[in-house]
Amino acid sequence: MGEEVQIGATAVGIKAKDGVVLAAEKRVSYGFYTLSSAGKKVFVIDDKLAIASAGIIADMQTLAKILKLNAKAYELEMKRKPSTHSMARLLSVIMFSRRFMPFFAEVLVGGIDEEGPHLIVMDPLGSLIEDNYAALGTGAKLAVAVLDTGYRPDITVEEAKKLAVQALKAAIERDPVSGGGIDLAIVDKNGAREEEVRVQLLI
């Protein structure tokens, strides 16, 4: 019989009053073997949208590429950026269409549009849930405990960045398949950008 192998990853998202913060740790693991400590699980789609994911790296990269291509095509045709919800619904349809051979990825979609900031949580089958904060992956239970304690409805982007890092550090310290450092994507009125936070590994 085949041995079950756990694919590790932890990602968090926080909706702030002035934007959205997404973050994920960088370790790529196969079971308890670390393949890399420089995996990218946070992707800027355009200057109003980003995603973070937990799951298999190849599936994350494929979904990010699909979203980038469709966001660009929409902008070229419609002469405006797609809304956060329209891109999330597109991703939902794509993921649900693969329900019999699903993408092994949970996704956080974060964006800002005319309606304000949005954080949308998606499972591998494309279910859509909008929330104020969320955590995905093997370290989600550890990370969400920090988010539960630290989140406020009036939290700012800068405060959300610090809270996201704290949540992921909690996961990295206790989840053996999370680690390597932290990537962040920040989406606010100034656009979307990525940042990196180095974390000392606990071995």
Swiss-Prot record:
Disulfide bonds: none annotated. Its EC number is 3.4.25.1. Gene3D superfamilies: Glutamine Phosphoribosylpyrophosphate, subunit 1, domain 1. The keyword Nucleotide-binding does not apply. GO terms for molecular function: endopeptidase activity; threonine-type endopeptidase activity. Residues 1-9 form a propeptide. It is an enzyme of class 3 (hydrolase). The formation of the proteasomal ATPase PAN-20S proteasome complex, via the docking of the C-termini of PAN into the intersubunit pockets in the alpha-rings, triggers opening of the gate for substrate entry. Interconversion between the open-gate and close-gate conformations leads to a dynamic regulation of the 20S proteasome proteolysis activity. Keywords: Autocatalytic cleavage, Cytoplasm, Hydrolase, Protease, Proteasome, Threonine protease, Zymogen. The keyword Repeat does not apply. InterPro entries: Ntn_hydrolases_N, Pept_T1A_Psome_bsu_arc, Pept_T1A_subB, Proteasome_bsu_CS, Proteasome_sua/b, Proteasome_suB-type. It is found in: Cytoplasm. PROSITE patterns: PROTEASOME_BETA_1 (PS00854), PROTEASOME_BETA_2 (PS51476). The active site is at residue 10. PANTHER family: ATP-DEPENDENT PROTEASE SUBUNIT HSLV, METALLOPROTEASE TLDD. The 20S proteasome core is composed of 14 alpha and 14 beta subunits that assemble into four stacked heptameric rings, resulting in a barrel-shaped structure. The two inner rings, each composed of seven catalytic beta subunits, are sandwiched by two outer rings, each composed of seven alpha subunits. The catalytic chamber with the active sites is on the inside of the barrel. Has a gated structure, the ends of the cylinder being occluded by the N-termini of the alpha-subunits. Is capped at one or both ends by the proteasome regulatory ATPase, PAN. Belongs to the peptidase T1B family. This is Proteasome subunit beta 2. It comes from Pyrobaculum aerophilum (strain ATCC 51768 / DSM 7523 / JCM 9630 / CIP 104966 / NBRC 100827 / IM2).
